[in-house]
Swiss-Prot record:
Subcellular location(s) per record: Cell membrane
Superkingdom in the source lineage: Bacteria
Gene3D superfamilies according to UniProt: Large-conductance mechanosensitive channel, MscL, domain 1
One GO cellular component term: plasma membrane
Subcellular location, principal: membrane
GO MF term (any one): mechanosensitive monoatomic ion channel activity
Similarity-based family: Belongs to the MscL family.
Alphabetized UniProt keyword annotations: Cell membrane, Ion channel, Ion transport, Membrane, Transmembrane, Transmembrane helix, Transport
Membrane spanning residue stretches: 14-34, 37-57, 66-86
Known partners and oligomeric status: Homopentamer.
Function description: Channel that opens in response to stretch forces in the membrane lipid bilayer. May participate in the regulation of osmotic pressure changes within the cell.
Organism name: Pediococcus pentosaceus (strain ATCC 25745 / CCUG 21536 / LMG 10740 / 183-1w)
The protein's name in its UniProt record: Large-conductance mechanosensitive channel
Amino acid sequence: MLKEFKEFVSRGNVLDLAVGVIIGGAFTSIVKSLVNYLINPLIGLFIGGIDFSDWVLKVAGATFKFGSFINAVINFLIIAFVVFILVKLVNKFLPKKEEQEDDEAEAIENSEIYLKEIRDALVNNPELLSNLKNKEDSTK
């Protein structure tokens, strides 16, 4: 059982996931500070110096901090955008699957063309076909 666990943990996917979670945790604090200390004040500057985190609604003793929710949405959008950019950059350097499939499809098409040419040559040249049949008979 210990050996199986070691194999499971040693697989690339598990290690990649662990690294992703650790880096994601560290990245979250960077994005939060970016949003809280740069983006929100910048947005507040354009809409009259309003800080979203101060927006609250109090109803019958309950406090709804929808400004904090707006900050969370901004955090999410920034993280999603940065991940999108990172994926685009990584995909730029990886070979495209479509190109590989196109190359394989082209090779198959070329093979079919050659086979059709051979077939047509045999059909149009009965002498060649009979020579091939004679060679087959002599090897038996």
